[in-house]
């Protein structure tokens, strides 16, 4: 069964992944090398560590075994902040950029507008080397790779948010996992009243805020009124719960998987990629339940793979072949099983091999990846996204705060960024 399409979210994503200035270079079909006949080396900057890097290396070795003329040199940049910083610094000297990189879309906006990133549309549709099954890539992931109406990346390591809950506790109270935000508040309130345990919380306040307003039909961009009704509702929904004791924030714990494991919070919204931390923390003390995010629209997170236009024609084709391999169904099954990331292919999400791999989250991810959205990739988007967390934390840390004046100050902050 195909994943359900969310027309509104997809349309917004495609229309809003835009920037100012020029667009990236356009490759025509006649420019594309369709066969690698001589040895070629490509470099790949990434920030994968631990089990992620082990799986990446394993898959890369398998690719090179199948493609004798292509050498892929993996260059670990240590962390996402370090990778972003190096990419930004190196854009001033395009000849020093790698062949391809792992990156978030908002990192690449200026590079795309400066013509430094290869548009992949002609490669994807090429009769000789193109994707035979590009539509199999989850739509919500594909839309995030489009900037200025062109495809500049292939989805790679993806995640979304899920509801983690203490199933033993909820079952004992005769409660079911909530499927809407209203139900989440009701169940959380019941848990708190019956047991004294905090009902729920959200790991990422920026995700909470932007997801809430998206489900209200709004888009978090320069035209959104952060003092308006949707913004007020987002703030007050969480604030009411904090005031009454049935919601909490992660705060100094950073992630709610710790309080969840220690049974001081009954439910929390967090990434599917955090499963190993949840399972190891709980360590069998109670049965863990997991369910899709309790709203129609869910945020998609994670990086995509971009190819730089400074590469030679042969390197571009070699890089594209590598992208195809890394996002093939077989590779995605391996990658998702090894790392806990969401496979980017619908066929893998639907497969029994994936659903029965022993993970708690795999049986529900087909449903959990319906209605995915991405925040608009526009100038200032990353900074304003982070500011939303600062705003939320400031309000939730002081339940006596004047919300209206705080949102007015938030509006002024955003006006200086957009």
Identify the role of each PLM range.
Residues 1-43, 65, 408, 412-418:
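Short, low-complexity disordered leader/linker segments with a strong preference
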Residues 37-49, 70-75, 99-100, 200, ...:
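Short, well-ordered beta-strand elements
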Residues 49-71, 388:
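Short, polar/charged alpha-helical segment
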Residues 62, 66-136, 173, 266-267, ...:
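Extracytoplasmic "Venus flytrap"/periplasmic binding protein-like
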Residues 66, 88, 280-341:
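Extracytoplasmic/periplasmic substrate-recognition and gating elements
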Residues 105-160, 193, 214, 287-291, ...:
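Hinge/lid segment of periplasmic solute-binding proteins
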Residues 187-190, 194, 223-250:
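Glycine-centered hinge/linker elements that transmit conformational signals in sensory
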Residues 337-390, 394-395:
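Long, aromatic- and glycine/proline-rich binding clefts that accommodate carbohydrate-like moieties
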